[in-house]
From Swiss-Prot:
Function: Negatively regulates lifespan.
Modified residues (N-acetylalanine): A2
A GO biological-process term: determination of adult lifespan
Pfam families: Ribosomal_S19 (PF00203)
Matches recorded under InterPro entries: Ribosomal_uS19, Ribosomal_uS19_CS, Ribosomal_uS19_euk/arc, Ribosomal_uS19_SF
Annotated organism of origin: Caenorhabditis elegans
The protein, known as: Small ribosomal subunit protein uS19
GO MF annotation terms: RNA binding; structural constituent of ribosome
Amino acid sequence: MATQDDAHLAELKKKRTFRKFMYRGVDLDQLLDMSREQFTKLLPCRMRRRLDRGLKRKHLALIAKVQKAKKAAGVLEKPATVKTHLRDMIILPELVGGVIGIYNGKVFNQTEIKPEMIGFYLGEFAISYKPVKHGRPGIGATHSSRFIPLK
């Protein structure tokens, strides 16, 4: 009896179910089948207005390059990196699965586009500044710093 329960529990652990990705109540397969106009209706206002004005030639070229790289890659391979300076590009469903090198002003940060990134800007995934790491205060920084011994 106990072995059957153990076997049943082990079988349940093997069949782990993962949460299916949904963007505003629509799963990824349906997002990929949608036209751009239908997808635009799901976006927040700022991005919806941006896409309603139309994508520029550079943005359309980036989408085409990413799709070409995804098509050229093998079944279980990562596609080739597509480098871009377009930090203001909105991540669309057709970009999911691609690898994009996003320029941060110094280097290209490689980023694999995942479904959770849909609706964000590319620039949000390549930080353009080095976060401040506060060290010791310098001389004259505060009145109490007069009593801090020099190195």
